Regions:
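Rossmann-like NAD(P)(H) cofactor-binding subdomain of soluble oxidoreductases
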Residues: 17, 42, 54-59, 63-130
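NAD(P)+-binding Rossmann beta1-loop-alpha1 motif at the extreme N-terminus of oxidoreductases
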Residues: 1-52, 56, 125
Length: 131
């Protein structure tokens, strides 16, 4: 059962996912990571914990969303390898980043999925493609 979800990157897609996840009946705890301290506005949302760096709480998540820019992946991947649970599913929302690049960046230690969606996810009307 999914209880904890981590989202790395706090941009528009992350905001959409948070808003939609909080509308479901499931009681998810969401760990949100972003280096920009201005994104701490999410801390006022129930069940959302904001951190400026990836930490040990990543290992408690069953699903990890990568909602970052592709050029940041090489830095983030090191923290995922260090703190992530190898049983977690890592779902990449990074535009233009092939699945084999993600697998290699994570040392092929995680179950990885590439997902393409759009901003309509905030309304529950997005078309999403999963690889």
């Amino acid at each position: 059962m999914i209880e904890n979800i981590s989202i790395i990157g706090a941009g528009n897609l992350a905001k959409c996912f948070i808003n939609r996840l909080l509308t479901y009946k499931g009681k998810y705890k969401i760990f949100l990571y972003d280096i920009d301290k201005r994104q701490d506005k999410y801390t006022s949302i129930k069940n959302v914990k904001f951190y400026r760096s990836i930490n040990q709480y990543l290992s408690e998540s069953q699903i990890v969303f990568l909602a970052i820019k592709p050029h940041d992946f090489k830095y983030v991947s090191k923290d995922i390898i260090e703190y992530g649970d190898k049983k977690s599913i890592v779902i990449s929302l990074m535009a233009g980043t092939k699945l084999n690049v993600i697998d290699q960046g994570l040392n092929k230690d995680f179950c990885t999925v590439r997902m393409m969606t759009n901003i309509n996810a905030q309304f529950g009307n997005a078309q999403s493609f999963i690889y």
